[in-house]
């Protein structure tokens, strides 16, 4: 028999505020690696959720869940985005935290 698997799970202390933000980033945000870059930033800060392009060709939509300070860091990054992006507008809708994600995913365009 092999060794038992060791699973890493992030556990937050009870005084950490967990939040959910639904964001829309508009401008030159498609074709500049925005989604992959956001996934990398979200993973760096331990934020879960998803990101996808919208069919209008100028909007990226994302849902971010995690500790408030980490989610705010991802939103702060999204105000500028990766090199080559030109963010014209960022809309944030705060929603009730659901804890429904295990990771951060790139979803197909909708």
Curated annotation (Swiss-Prot):
Keywords: Hydrolase. The gene is acyP. GO terms for molecular function: acylphosphatase activity. It catalyses: an acyl phosphate + H2O = a carboxylate + phosphate + H(+). InterPro entries: Acylphosphatase, Acylphosphatase-like_dom, Acylphosphatase-like_dom_sf, Acylphosphatase_CS. The active site is at 35, 53. It comes from the Archaea. This is Acylphosphatase. Belongs to the acylphosphatase family. Its EC number is 3.6.1.7. Gene3D superfamilies: 3.30.70.100. It comes from Pyrobaculum calidifontis (strain DSM 21063 / JCM 11548 / VA1). It is an enzyme of class 3 (hydrolase). Pfam families: Acylphosphatase (PF00708). Residues 20-108 form the Acylphosphatase-like domain. PROSITE patterns: ACYLPHOSPHATASE_1, ACYLPHOSPHATASE_3.
